[in-house]
Amino acid sequence: MSGVSIIRTLLVANSSLLAVVPAEKIMAGVIPIGTVLPAIGITSISGMPKSTIRTDEVTLWTDRVQVTVEAKSYPSQKSILALVRDAIPAKRGTVGSFYCDSISPDIEGPDIFDSEPAISAGSQDFLVRYVR
């Protein structure tokens, strides 16, 4: 869950995003049914260690992390996804208690709609490489 923790740490530290989505609505895991929108869920899609010649206690790990935005309208969902992308820069260094080798955007997911209740959802994946 370290990739998820890294992404959440960056999101809740971004004042522009927090002006639209409060920190308590930026959560690790799936957004619960009935949550007042907008909300952001952060989930781990996959992870794998990087094979290196070096064999010590430090392992470089890559997680694919998906950030899903649920909002009441399509324009709102798209603008929040843009804020999410802005809040997660290509970065190297310490984030929370983890050392990040890199964070890079990956695939943007499909737009998903539910008419009852009115929910517009979309996602953005990130590749998070960190020392585990």
Describe the role of every protein-language-model region.
Residues 10, 26, 51, 61-64, ...:
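Generic preference for well-ordered secondary structure
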Residues 86-132:
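Acidic-leaning, charged glycine-interspersed low-complexity segments
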Residues 1-55, 75, 91-99:
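Small/polar-rich, solvent-exposed N-terminal microdomains that initiate assembly or binding
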Residues 67-74, 79-80, 101-113:
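Repeat-unit-sized solenoid/scaffold elements
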Residues 52, 83-87:
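Signature of extracytoplasmic/envelope-associated structural regions
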Residues 33, 56-58, 115-117:
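Sterically constrained small-residue positions within well-ordered secondary structures
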Residues 45, 55-58, 62, 104:
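A generic structural signal for ordered alpha-helices
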